[in-house]
Amino acid sequence: MLFWNADPILIQLGPIAVHWYGALFATGFLLGYQLMQRIYRQEGRPTEQLDKLLTYIFIGTVVGARLAHTLIYEPEYYLAHPIDILKIWEGGLASHGGGIGVLLAIWLFVRQHPENKFLWLADRLAIPTALTGCFIRLGNFMNSEIIGNSTDGSWGVVFERIDTLPRHPVQLYEAASYFAIFVLLLMLFRTTKSKQTGFLFGLFLTLVFAARFIIEYFKTPQAAYEAGNLISVGQWLSVPFVLAGIVLMLLSAKEKAR
């Protein structure tokens, strides 16, 4: 059993506080950026557009994830304290909203740069996105947020800032799942699967949101109105992503068979 009471602030520089959550988010994003540069170079693509593309994605991720969290999980609080919506370094990003924000960002980028194809980009961006998701969940762990149900298992974590109960470290479950998905996607990208348009993106959607659906059963409700529900809001929101991923993989396989 682990007793956990980490300080959410990584370092204090005078009046400026660098939070673990923000630092881990930035680390994941920067590593993803480096990976995309390598992918572009390996495929003989110019890297000049990457800065613009990833700026769009960063904005889409943060805005989409933050708005989804505030509107779905804590609408009463943020309607009463709207300025707190801007405090993203304190945590509170919903992955479903972030996913939608990323898709909109890619769509907007492709509209402005039609020489790029949506699914070609999505297949490749899926790889660093899984890695970034891993780092974001580690940030949640450092913040002692998105906690799990109580457990009698020896792997339980007591989040001392919350209570004295040993709980499932669901943040670490998700982080490990996303890292495993990242490794799998990276391995498949080095095979002929990278030539099947839409396959890697479809696999990403299916695995990430299937993992999210399963792990939700070990989480405490993130909103009061979820208490007692057999299916959580996060699970309902995951279903369309899983179905979309399966459809993309089937279409990719059908195209390959032609």
Swiss-Prot record:
Topology with respect to the bilayer: Multi-pass membrane protein
Pfam families registered for this protein in UniProt: LGT (PF01790)
Protein name: Phosphatidylglycerol--prolipoprotein diacylglyceryl transferase
Provenance organism: Tolumonas auensis (strain DSM 9187 / NBRC 110442 / TA 4)
PROSITE patterns (UniProt xref): LGT
Subcellular localization(s) per the UniProt record: Cell inner membrane
Lineage, highest ranks first: Bacteria, Pseudomonadati, Pseudomonadota, Gammaproteobacteria, Aeromonadales
Keyword entries, A-Z: Cell inner membrane, Cell membrane, Membrane, Transferase, Transmembrane, Transmembrane helix
Keyword Protease part of the UniProt annotation: no
Protein task: Catalyzes the transfer of the diacylglyceryl group from phosphatidylglycerol to the sulfhydryl group of the N-terminal cysteine of a prolipoprotein, the first step in the formation of mature lipoproteins.
GO biological process: lipoprotein biosynthetic process
UniProt cross-references to HAMAP family, sorted A to Z: Lgt (MF_01147)
Record GO terms (molecular function): phosphatidylglycerol-prolipoprotein diacylglyceryl transferase activity
Xref: NCBIfam families: lgt
